[in-house]
């Protein structure tokens, strides 16, 4: 019977390799440095006590809170189940299966390509330049035929680099009237001056993805935002599910956007950025480390000698890192999430033991 059920699945789904999230991969650790989560849990108490009614499709108080945070209007924002749902909804709303295409620029977040595969939308893969990780604007411009969406992660995951605003503006200009450019700013709180939010009024083809999972330390509630001009948001309203955000999630999200909570978030970011600077300096002194890439986020990409031995040994000791060896131009690389100071110190000490 199992074989018959598999045959009922769509052909592209039968061939699909699902995204391997940190939790799906597993591991039995006590030092989790593989999912770019906050090492600090932020306590919130639910204020809402009534749950017998369905929530608003788009909780107005949450829209207002986030609009105030980013300096936009409510009708320029869509609340989603993490930024991941925003990635999916954009493909669902704008790409014709078997006809249209997306562009993405590996090494980067895999869910752009996986969502396109699920929707049977063509993927045009245009890698960034090795080591600098700059986007290949000339190659992108030459491959715009059939392309509806271009996904750029900024800061980029897993490399940690920033795509310059000049490059992004050039991309937006060349695609105006033809393609939408989606800037995934999941990690932008760690480098806020590089946000493209202020350009939403200038470029109607600009869309920005945000989340509460990283700097806001709320990965467990799955709450994200799509920012765009009203016309784009109106289209996305047509394809989002009726009740995407639960009453409890909206309640916690609103609390996280209060002034004190935002101030606390900025202080956590400051500490994590200091930990990142310290960790980069320490890693550069260790003999098994071949190269440490600069980062503007809460993680570092590191190329190792004895890559496999190091990854497995740390795993067995309960220090869980993210393997990037299989990705474009990332041979022998691991991504290290910035943890607490004690977690970073433990990692450094273990790495010093390798000869």
Swiss-Prot record:
It comes from the Bacteria. PROSITE patterns: AA_TRANSFER_CLASS_2. The modification N6-(pyridoxal phosphate)lysine is found at residue 214. Disulfide bonds: none annotated. Its EC number is 2.6.1.9. GO terms for molecular function: histidinol-phosphate transaminase activity; pyridoxal phosphate binding. It catalyses: L-histidinol phosphate + 2-oxoglutarate = 3-(imidazol-4-yl)-2-oxopropyl phosphate + L-glutamate. Its cofactor is pyridoxal 5'-phosphate. InterPro entries: Aminotrans_II_pyridoxalP_BS, Aminotransferase_I/II_large, HisP_aminotrans, PyrdxlP-dep_Trfase, PyrdxlP-dep_Trfase_major, PyrdxlP-dep_Trfase_small. Pathway: Amino-acid biosynthesis; L-histidine biosynthesis; L-histidine from 5-phospho-alpha-D-ribose 1-diphosphate: step 7/9. The keyword Membrane does not apply. PANTHER family: HISTIDINOL-PHOSPHATE AMINOTRANSFERASE (PTHR42885:SF2), HISTIDINOL-PHOSPHATE AMINOTRANSFERASE-RELATED (PTHR42885). Homodimer. Belongs to the class-II pyridoxal-phosphate-dependent aminotransferase family. Histidinol-phosphate aminotransferase subfamily. This is Histidinol-phosphate aminotransferase. It comes from Buchnera aphidicola subsp. Schizaphis graminum (strain Sg).
